[in-house]
């Protein structure tokens, strides 16, 4: 850990293996959470996504979230048969599919950092939330606006503001 990183970032990294701001660094590429395609700095992530993220990341992400693949497809509004075919052939994901999975990975990391417990994080992500219009946080990650709303809600929780 660098000396110039805030203490909260250091505590979150120590507890969850993921930085508090949800950014996956190079050291997290081999961590139990996170996808190598989404690891590194922003330019690495962009390069990886432009060259195509393999569909075989989906089962691991679903497992980390504690949902089935079908449940993940439904929550993120991903086409079920297309995703199943991509996974079985280990094809690359489309840009919109990658974006949804990237947002999901970042929100999972942020949720783990804020709630500091994997079981609590998984439960929070799939439970309907009044603050989010009665939707589960994962169900909002199909859009950028929903992603921002979920991150804002996590920020409120982190700072003790009623969310």
Identify the function of each model-found stretch.
Residues 1-163:
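Non-transmembrane "mature" sequence context
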């Amino acid at each position: 850990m660098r000396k110039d990183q805030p203490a909260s970032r250091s505590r979150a990294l120590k507890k969850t293996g993921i930085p508090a701001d949800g950014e996956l660094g190079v050291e997290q590429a081999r961590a139990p959470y996170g996808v190598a395609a989404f690891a590194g700095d922003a330019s690495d992530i962009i390069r990886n996504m432009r060259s195509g993220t393999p569909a075989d990341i989906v089962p691991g992400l679903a497992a980390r979230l504690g949902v089935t693949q079908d449940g993940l497809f439904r929550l993120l509004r991903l086409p079920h048969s297309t995703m199943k075919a991509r996974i079985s052939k280990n094809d690359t994901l489309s840009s919109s599919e990658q974006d949804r999975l990237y947002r999901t990975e970042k929100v999972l990391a942020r949720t783990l950092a804020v709630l500091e417990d994997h079981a609590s994080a998984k439960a929070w992500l799939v439970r309907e939330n009044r603050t989010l219009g009665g939707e589960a946080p994962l169900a909002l990650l199909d859009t950028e606006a929903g992603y921002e709303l979920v991150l804002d809600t996590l920020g409120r929780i982190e700072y003790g503001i009623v969310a």
